[in-house]
UniProtKB/Swiss-Prot annotation:
Family as reported in the entry's similarity comment: Belongs to the complex I 49 kDa subunit family.
GO CC aspect terms: chloroplast thylakoid membrane
Protein name in the entry: NAD(P)H-quinone oxidoreductase subunit H, chloroplastic
Species assigned in the record: Panax ginseng
Enzyme Commission numbers on file: 7.1.1.-
Role, per record: NDH shuttles electrons from NAD(P)H:plastoquinone, via FMN and iron-sulfur (Fe-S) centers, to quinones in the photosynthetic chain and possibly in a chloroplast respiratory chain. The immediate electron acceptor for the enzyme in this species is believed to be plastoquinone. Couples the redox reaction to proton translocation, and thus conserves the redox energy in a proton gradient.
Amino acid sequence: MTASATRNDLMIVNLGPQHPSMHGVLRLIVTLDGEDVIDCEPILGYLHRGMEKIAENRTIIQYLPYVTRWDYLATMFTEAITVNAPEQLGNIQVPKRASYIRVIMLELSRIASHLLWLGPFLADIGAQTPFFYIFRERELIYDLFEAATGMRMMHNYFRIGGVAADLPHGWIDKCLDFCDFFLTRVTEYQKLITRNPIFLERVEGVGIIGGAEAINWGLSGPMLRASGIQWDLRKVDHYESYDEFDWGVQWQKEGDSLARYLVRISEMTESIKIIQQALEGIPGGPYENLEIRRFDKVRDPEWNDFDYRFISKKPSPTFELSKQELYVRVEAPKGELGIFLIGDRGVFPWRWKIRPPGFINLQILPQLVKRMKLADIMTILGSIDIIMGEVDR
């Protein structure tokens, strides 16, 4: 075969589903002209487990352990959205102490998720050292989770009307110590990474998304805020107790992979600010709204009867969903995590539609990698931050 015959031949390369840079079981069919990417087709579904259909055959309390398997690196957010939806359907009030505890857990989970994005992202583009550093801090967060919930991952901690258990003795002091320590670690990350010339060469100007383009594609989270759009659901939807704390929306206007890195690094610092304020101002009172027992079939319980005092201290699995529909969302580490819930006067949801941020954000990947080099696929995909358990559901 002559050289002229092969010069214009395109090559098709399969990346994944086992390749470590695919962050799970994502498969990309990439068409190359030399080193230049001509086309990229993501193949999904390798981790599909029918999560939406399972929800239609479980009560909310029975379904809670399943939801932590969507985004298994930020499980507090999947739990939060699962209990927020029936709380809004039933107009259930969450005690102030429980709301503060939720905020603390959510922000710790956000930091843990961003840390486990940072390490593999840098490993993908050739920097191995931070990959080991981030696990050092992440272990401290998991120790806090274990002390409060009994589980390092898959916590099963949130409940309709509050949380499963109060914070143990000494936990608040340990968490404050972690916050002070972690701020010094973030400074270390920035010294090590942010101005590293090799890192900047790999990420600056790579995978640029404009603000209007990000909105048109339905992007959310750091992907959207790195394109100059100051949109954060914690500010927009005023859920939990976020309005009571002093913090700012972190954003950049460049829209490239470096901007997405800077947004996430800044978000970790802001999360620490929120956690510190919540720990210092956490009120007393109950950690769970026991009044939600009235949503059971017995409308007027005897407050001193045997069932209430010794059995029904926790939300009943027979919590009924009224005949309504609503969309509930939270600001997860990867973007807008939403649930479209339809109740049908039964204990099971009639429809439970999940809006995963990773799945929506992944849509733009084929457009971003076109006319880029093959090595830039790892940079761009890493900067999107996906978890396949959430993408495939």
